[in-house]
Amino acid sequence: MELRNMNEAEAFKSVLNSCTGSVWMVSTLTGRHYDMKNEHDQLLSMGKMLSGNGRDMEIYADTRADQSRIMNFMVEQMAA
């Protein structure tokens, strides 16, 4: 997953903060887990996504509602 600019990063952060369950990202290269409800981990993972190194990041959410929120955000960003 990649972000193209700070506006997308802020919008993504807003989506993450609206999630009610656990949300995490995993680097497929290193296996590192990022807790996306933790501000420090958000900054680290978003830095990767903004720098073009987010292709190896996979996102997961505990609840279907959160999965839907994140998927809707991703679809909207691809359409923009």
Located regions from the model:
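C-terminal structural segments of small proteins and small subunits
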Residues: 50-80
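Generic alpha-helical scaffold signal
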Residues: 6, 36, 61-64
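Short, well-ordered secondary-structure micro-motifs
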Residues: 36-37, 70
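Compact, glycine-rich, soluble single-domain proteins
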Residues: 2-28, 33, 40-41, 47-49
